[in-house]
Amino acid sequence: MELIGLRYLNRLLNLVTICMLLLSSCSIDRTEKTVSLKERLYTITDTVPGIVGIAFISDADTVTINNSVRYPMMSVFKLHQALAVAHEINARHSSIDSVIHVSKDELDMETWSPMLKIYKTPCFDISLRDLIKYALTVSDNNASNLLFKRIVSPSATDSLIRLISDDSTFRIVYSEDEMKVKHSLAYTNYSSPLSAASLIRQVFDSTFTIDSTFTTNSTSNSNSAIDSIRKDLTTVATGLDRLGAIKPQHPELFFAHKTGSGYRNDANELSAHNDVGYFRLPDGRAYALAVFIRDFSGTEAEASEIIAGISHEVYDYFVSK
């Protein structure tokens, strides 16, 4: 009996050892894949005349490069702004289709503002839905400035998004209007790549709503606002040569994003060239990717090419898993 018991114990120990080795092998394999992606990305970033920050998030992996650096967000903050406006609409028991009256003295006629090609009169009415759409899809600065002045301020936007973000490594202090006057203020509106990637991933989570996130009363208006924001992010017309450069080869890919483009700093470097996106394959698998470039001593086209190259590498890595 003692001999049988000893044999049984030895077999049990052998099985436990085998299981531990298998689990260890799986862990090593997954780590090697993650490191492999980092190595592939470093081959791109190591030669860039600037600082490149990357964050990739999927259900299985999170990979970051230079994530501890503070990157000027530029118009990426309009994603945060749109979500804060959606919350404020809900808090006021209002609607995204509410209309505000705008007078010419509220507008900057010398800033980037495609909406002024449509709204040419000295005074006009425009819905909050359209202001959000202009701010997101064409990065309209007047639309953003109006939303900050009329609906929710930069500081309130910062506070509200901190309540919902999985990663609060960001700061929003100044509007487009203020940054135009003093370009260096753009460095104060910063984000880590991981924070931006986390936020856009949250937005496209099917369970995400303004109501449950901000613990306010549920209304159809708030859900309508989030749906509108999601739709707008899929029709962003700026920076199509950045993360979305992979889209023509993969038309079946769901893609939504928000770009940000910076001024030249005192060293004549491009202060910011950014894109944060959400990608979903037809099989339902999805990932978020943020690429932020700061202090780049090249052209915007060259910076876009770097972002596009990173997007291609990440896509190839993800679909091969």
Residue ranges of each PLM-predicted region?
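C-terminal motif of bacterial Sec signal peptides marking the signal peptidase cleavage site
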Residues: 23-25
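Acidic helix-start/capping segments at beta-turn-to-alpha-helix junctions
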Residues: 96-115, 151-153, 232-233
